[in-house]
Structure formats: C-alpha cells, structure tokens
Amino acid sequence: MVLALPSALYSYGQKKGNASLAFDEMLTAENLPRPPYKDYHEWYAAQDTAHLIRKTQDAENIFRKTGITFAVYGHADSSEKLIPFDIIPRIISAREWRKLAQGIEQRVLALNAFLDDIYHKQEIIKAGRIPRELIEKNVAFLPEMIGFKPPGGVYTHIVGTDIVRTGEDQFYVLEDNARTPSGVSYMLENRETMMQMFPELFTLNKVQRVEDYPRLLRQSLAAVAPPGCKGKPRVAVLTPGIYNSAYYEHSFLADQMGVELVEGSDLRVLDGKVQMRTTRGYEAIDVLYRRVDDDFLDPLTFRPDSALGIPGIMDVYRAGNVTIANAPGTGICDDKAIYSYMPEIVEFYTGRKALLENVPTWRCSEPASLKYVLENIADLVIKEVHGSGGYGMLVGPTATKKERSDFAEKLSARPSNYIAQPTLALSTVPIFVNKGIAPRHVDLRPYVLVSDKVKIIPGGLTRVAIKQGSLVVNSSQGGGTKDTWVLED
C-alpha cells in the first residue's frame, strides 16, 4: 500500500524559490514516494510530529556530548559550533549507487594516473590535452615531487568526490577533493546516531554499512607502507593540533583506527626514518596520514616558519622510508581550473569517456569565456580556482546588484583566479522542520580509499543547505548533514 503523507506534516506543496524547479529525491510530481523511499515514507506517515521534534533535540544533545564541533576561522565568533544534523535520511537505491560507484572509481584512478604523469613523463601535456602553464604555474604543483613515485605508486590514498544530482539519472561531479578531504567523521557519527535513535528503521530498510570505514582505512594505509617495512606497519595521524577546525575528526579517526594521533613536535627524523617519541624512546612510523597542508609539512623544504611539520620529512619520503597519505602535491587535483579538464583527463588515462559528467565550466582565463561570464554574471556561480568551503564565491541569482558589481571588478582584475558554472537546480531531499518536512538542496561526498585496490564506502556524507532556497551546503556557510543510506538489492 502506498500512503501519501498528511498535508499537515508535509510542506512540499508550498515549495518556493529554487526548490520548485528541482528534482525531488523522495517524491514524484504526483506526491508519491519514489521506490527507495517507499518503506521510510510509510513509517514517517505514522509518526507524531512532537515525537520527531524530541528526537531532533536528542540528536543535538548526542552531538554536543560527543563533542562533534567545528570552528569557522575569520569570523567574529570563532567558537566551536555544532553542524546541524537532520534526522531524515537521504536514501539511494542499489542501482543508483552502482552507477555512481563505477564513475567514481574511474575518476579516482584517472586522478592517480594524472598525478603520476605530471610528476614524471607529462604525456598529457605533450599530447596537447592540457596547457603546460596550468600545471607548472599552479601553486599546488610541487617541483619537489618531480621524478618521485610514492610507495605503491599511490598518490591519492583518500579521496572525497563531491557529487550533485539534477534528475532521475543525472549526476555530476562538482569537485574533487584529493588533498585532505574532511567530513568522514560526520558520516560515521550520523549513522551511529540514527541507529541509536531509530533502530526499527534499520530492520525495515536493508542499509549497507559504513561503520567499517576506520578498519578499512587502516588496512588501506598499511597496504601502502614502504617496501622496507618489516612486520605490521605502524600508522599515525598527523594533526596541526587542537586549534585546527577539524581536530575532532583527526582525534576521532586515530582513536577508531587504534593508532597514534601526533603533532609535528612529537616526531623527528632519526637514522633516515620518521620517529615518534614514546615512553620507550623513539620508534619509527611507516605510514603518516597527514592532515597538515603541504606548505607546513617540512620547514626545510617548504615554509621555514612552519611549526606544524617535521624538519627533513621530505628527504625521508623521497628516500622511500615513509609513506605520506595523501602524497604531497595532490592538491593540484583540487584546483577548479584543472577540474574543467577532467573529461579529457579521464579519457586520456582510461581510454573511455567519463561515466560521471562534469558541471559545464567556463575558464575565466580565456577571453571569450571571461566576456560571457561578465555579461551573464547574474545567472552564474563563480568560484576561485583554489577556493574551498564556500568562500570566495558568488552565486549570481541570489547576489545583490552591488555584490555582482564588486565581484565583476575582482574577476576582471584577476580572471585566471576564477571559473564559472551554470546555476544548477540541485536535487532536494526533505529536512525535518517544526511544522513537518520541507525540501532542501543537497550534495554528496562519497569517500574512496585507494591502495592496491579501490574501496568506495557505500553512501558518504550528504551535506544539506538548511536555509530555504540556498544552494550552499558547506558547514562554514551554515549547511548541515544527513545520514546517507545506500540500500541493498
């Protein structure tokens, strides 16, 4: 039996703004549940709104007690904040997930091949598929990595691929996060919280597991230990320290993997190895999962004023005596100008068309593109090529006339610093509000582990624009998160 949700509980009928044009992942145009949501839809229809309000409050209390917070630097109030968590899951069918997983694996393998190529033979440049200056003048390109192959030949050990949806079978990659992708702790805590609060839902719905991620991460890191490693590889997580906005995640992952959480001051280079200070003296580290940016990794190689890294670690790395995950120099794959070439990159290294499409992108460094973007700035989303976290971007349709004018000046002054994309009607998923549920735009960050094999965690982190009409899902801009369910066949 298919139930339509009571109108008092379901506010989709009053869609406004961008949401009215978007593909809704839960309901059809006839207000009927799509297949992945059928069982959840029936369960929700029988729930009491007051009960769900209490559950939302319970979830907030769980997150607060657990200490799952983040800080937004540069704001007047940079205190630790909770990321809003929504109790309504995002549900993806097994068929939909298979399609996504195939495209993600193809893309991640292409990224790794691209990194190996640009730091060695540079065949893609010689073939004229990507401009030389885009690589060699890129601030994220590290000459120190030229000619060096990391242990196992893996550059991108952990990847977060941001995906958006615009229709039934229309998925796009929004960006690649190949340097230090974050957010996986929220994926894990979201699932644990949902299982604690709604155990009956996991009996009703056969949901694929994400809880194995810490174990799989440790296995994946151990698999790329240096060739000279004897016995069980020693893994550690390198954090910038307690004042970093993602420190909770660093601590959480180290604890869940059962490995040491270290800062640069805990490590030193001795006898050609990276050694960790312990109560028994110094002991060698084989694999370092670093959450410290390239610039701060080694003050002898990069920024001499860095107190976060380990002096001499790059010499140990290049000698093949430690694995750094992700490899230094992978940040070039996060560059949004490089992103615009991903269809060519995927085809060049895999011999096949990309299974997952890019969002159409104008490179503002090109005069014709710049002219188009300036003339159509009110309709476009404009981003800094090295930007992240929703900073430094303009969403034309929601910006004021003055904001667009000011941004056009910045764009004209440094066109190579920007790309532009159409304003997509991102798919919507319901969030719980005091009057029932309402549609909000979402994206998805699946997490990929790469060693001698590729492992994609089923689901990932769904980020949701909590504010009505907003397309910005970043937590630094007020976005929230959801548990993401991938159903079994």
Where are the predicted features?
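Preference for protein termini
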Residues: 3-489
